[in-house]
Amino acid sequence: MANITMKALLEAGVHFGHQTRRWNPKMAKFIFGMRNKIHIIDLQKTLKELKKNYKVVRDFTSTGKDIIFVGTKKQARLPIKEEALRCGAYFVSERWLGGTLTNFETLKKSITRYKEIEDMKETGVFKLLSKKEQSRIEKERIKLEKSLEGLKNMSSLPGLMFVVDSHEETTAILEARKLEIPIVAVCDTNCNPDLVDYPIPGNDDAIRAVKLFCTVIADAVLEGKSIIGKQEDNKVKEAAIEVK
């Protein structure tokens, strides 16, 4: 894990929670105090949980399990997409479609249709259609892309979920819980940390804070995958020695 410091957390505004009247009492153990009717998050606890959950994500992905990044509110969309793409994770940065996980077979049909349209465009078949048909299919493609851009290569359910703002992404979290998929989530002072397996207390509204969290988790995924790579290299070397 990159050397994330208290200073880095402070500069990103990770310590700023919500207005005190909007708090969830279950977040009390992560709150340091209040200032101007705003709850202040205990950054020592944030740092502790961030380091712990980095190891959780690294260890999960080192076994070959896939992870899905979820963050659909405005501040989270770009960091979620950028960091998921960087580490090769699935992601949902637009609206979460109900049944994405719990009705996975239906989702796979939508993915198949999306890929069919993409193939039509790549092979030139699309240009052979009438203007009216092209317009209809293009509208369908745009709609599917908005929902499936980060899921088009997902052939099976992910083994882990990372969420920015557990309060906002309740539907995704409930689906993951139903399927017993572990959840790592950034929880602000208005969230219920009991709904997720691995809460990270922190500001889930400030763009810099969200970017920091997404970057750390993506780094953990990449480290986990590098462990797989090293294990495979060792197997190849062992096989070569046996052949000799």
From Swiss-Prot:
The molecule here is called Small ribosomal subunit protein uS2
Which superkingdom heads the taxonomic lineage of this protein's source? Bacteria
One GO cellular component term, please give it. Answer: cytosolic small ribosomal subunit
Q: Which PROSITE patterns match?
A: RIBOSOMAL_S2_1 (PS00962)
Per the record, the GO terms for biological process are:
translation
Q: Does the keyword Ribonucleoprotein apply?
A: yes
User: What are the entry keywords?
Assistant: Ribonucleoprotein, Ribosomal protein
- Organism of derivation: Endomicrobium trichonymphae
What GO molecular functions are on record for this protein?
structural constituent of ribosome
> What protein family does this chain belong to?
Belongs to the universal ribosomal protein uS2 family.
InterPro entries recorded for this chain?
A: Ribosomal_uS2, Ribosomal_uS2_bac/mit/plastid, Ribosomal_uS2_CS, Ribosomal_uS2_flav_dom_sf
